A protein has these predicted regions:
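Bacterial N-terminal signal peptides that target proteins for export
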Residues: 1-7
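Flexible loop/hinge segments at secondary-structure junctions
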Residues: 17-315
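Bacterial N-terminal signal peptides
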Residues: 8-16
Length: 315
């Protein structure tokens, strides 16, 4: 996603037109907030970091991009304050983090729909069934050309792009398409950077990829989205179909906050408060589907209860 271009629209938020809440704290506060993890959550986290640093220029907020799995490893090692994730924490990750005696709070940010995309000149693959998607991506797949999927389609090799194994998108996609997480063919171009997939699909008429909805929305002139059919009619991802769950690959986006970091570092607690007060507007601006306001209010209450009460603010 072109995050820098995105910040032009985020400047509009800062005027208050989208209910942007300028959380008040010590303008001279110093410190560092470290986030790492999901490439899907990255646009929200990066936008929040930039807006927060306009208010608190002496606080350094770093946002890493090592994939959900990579972020969880760093979170479990105590290397970061916040892990960003495009899926729920796995049992093995929970166990490792608990063994490290790290207490945390899970905070929902928004909803997303993993989008299957093709080149704009692809006029044949307008929709796929979930069964066909499984045939394409299963280990040892016999699908090599478009004609292998449908006899009426071109006998041209499919160039596949997708997230790498550290990605939460990879985990969620394989679990919901294959029925087993991390089960996938390996002969595809794998990357933790969604822009690699955008570029690959936009330049190859016979390419296919899957990525977060915000990356499709930001680059829709460079690719077509494929409608997916699970039981009956094929459905394309949109704010409505993702929110109501009719799109087959709708999923949650979350962050995990180290409670000790929030308790001992006021800049971390203030950043999380700022994030949760503004994430609805930020999510919408970057192309994801915001949750209900009541969810954010309850989430912030839960976070404050876990970390010693409301953020202390000064004017």
């Amino acid at each position: 996603m072109k995050v820098r271009n995105l910040m032009l629209s985020l400047a509009f938020i800062a005027t208050g037109c989208h209910g942007f809440a300028a959380t008040k704290g010590d303008k001279h506060m110093r410190g560092e907030v470290k986030l790492d993890g999901s490439s899907t959550v990255f646009p929200i986290a990066e936008a929040a970091a930039e807006e927060f640093q306009k208010l608190y220029p002496r606080v350094r907020v770093t946002v890493g991009l090592s994939g959900t799995g990579g972020g969880m490893k760093k979170f479990g090692s105590g290397d970061i304050d916040i892990a960003t994730a495009s899926r729920k924490m796995k049992p093995a990750e929970t166990k490792r983090i608990q063994e490290a005696k790290i207490e945390y709070t899970e905070l929902p940010l928004a909803s997303d729909g993993i989008s299957v995309v093709v080149n704009p000149s692809n006029t044949w693959a307008t929709q796929l069934t979930m069964a066909q998607l499984k045939q394409i991506w299963q280990p040892g797949s016999s699908i090599k050309t478009w004609k292998d999927i449908n006899p009426a389609w071109p006998q041209e090799k499919i160039k596949l792009y997708g997230p790498g194994p550290d990605s939460g998108t990879f985990d969620f996609f394989t679990e919901h398409v294959m029925g087993t997480a991390r089960l996938s063919r390996s002969d595809y171009v794998a990357s933790e950077d969604d822009n690699v997939m955008v570029t690959g699909v936009s330049k190859d008429r016979f390419a296919m990829a899957y990525l977060g909805y915000a990356y499709y929305e930001e680059n829709k002139k460079l690719m077509n989205v494929v409608a997916l059919a699970k039981d009956k009619d094929a459905v394309i991802p949109s704010p409505k179909t993702i929110e109501d769950g009719t799109y087959p690959l709708a999923r949650p986006l979350v962050v995990y906050v180290n409670n000790k970091s929030a308790q001992q570092k006021p800049e971390v607690k203030l950043f999380v408060t700022f994030l949760m007060q503004n994430v609805g507007a930020l999510a919408k601006e970057v192309g994801y589907i915001p949750l209900k306001d009541a969810v954010y209010t309850e989430t912030l209450r839960k976070f404050e209860a876990a970390t010693g009460g409301p953020t202390q603010q000064s004017h």
